[in-house]
Amino acid sequence: MAAGATIHQFEIAVSDVDRSVYETLDLRVAQHPSETMPRLLVRTLAYCLAYEEGIAFSKGGLGAVEDAPIAVHDPTGLLLHWIEIGAPSAERLHKASKMGRLSIYTHEFAQLRRHVAGKTIHKADAIEVWPFDASFI
């Protein structure tokens, strides 16, 4: 029998003066059995740092290869912001960058650089990369 997801609960106060975002988030984040704790923490931090109306974790979890791990949609369902975690492949980034705004939050910056080195990625210069030092995570 396969192990199920572990649910982690976080209460995080978000205060961003520049964007006028002041929220207390009560998050219940599911950790897939194959997901490492550092990746879960980066995913949770990415959600908080990118927080805005319409943000949501992927409903399909790690198995949803066609969806962003975190995405921001407008009220009509239009994708506004695709948020990747870790070190996604260049092919995935190429596809995601055509969808709208793309950000990557990573604790695996060296691996991310290896994945994209010499590859063609649509609007590569517009991709926002937010690296976390491994010692921080």
Where are these predicted regions, by residue range?
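Conserved catalytic cores of phosphodiester-cleaving nucleases, focusing on short active-site segments
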Residues: 70-72, 77-93
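Catalytic beta/alpha-barrel core
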Residues: 82-86, 104-106, 130-131
